[in-house]
Amino acid sequence: MNATSAVRCRRAGFNPPLLILALALTGCLQPQQRAEEFSAASWPARREALQSLDHWSLQSRIALSTDEEGWSGTLTWRQDENYVDARFSGPLGVGGFRIEGVPERLELETSEGEHFVFTDPEAELAAELGWRVPLASMRYWMLGVADPQSGDAEETLDEHGRLEELEQRDWTVRYTSYRSFDGDTLPRKLVMENDDLRIRLAVDDWELGGPRL
């Protein structure tokens, strides 16, 4: 069931926090139209198109922080429908991991050889650390659109009719930069945050409609 969105237009050993980052990355980013084609009137159609796209890959820098600590590194992400293959490398290759699978069953392997299987990732993470990360929603938030399965959302569009800020499930997502990648205008920088976590992405490259995994 699609979310009902209120749109405003405006001018102008294995470290548990790495587990948070790995699980939080089960979202996706997707293409948008050229900036000159954007408008508030075209947003509903573009929202639906973005929510339906599911074959892509990206390379990005990523940083995660809590009130006490922070982590950063690089991310290589491949999405094939509901199947994800994401690889994180920390500074100098330290603290890396790979996560792959579908939302109902995710496997995580660290650079130290540790292996984890999650059959209910969001609930298991909440039980482990007391922080509930909206994993399924992040797939859509990173793409630049509200999660169609997660109820009402409040969207703010920028002067070009692109998503600038999103509020959903007690999270705020801010899109601070867009850029053209091979003719498609995509989120370049975004921040996802709630009272417990802050996740920043700076995307360096996209490939759309690539070979399936």
Describe the residue ranges of each PLM region.
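Gly/Pro-enriched, hydrophobic low-complexity segments
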Residues: 144-213
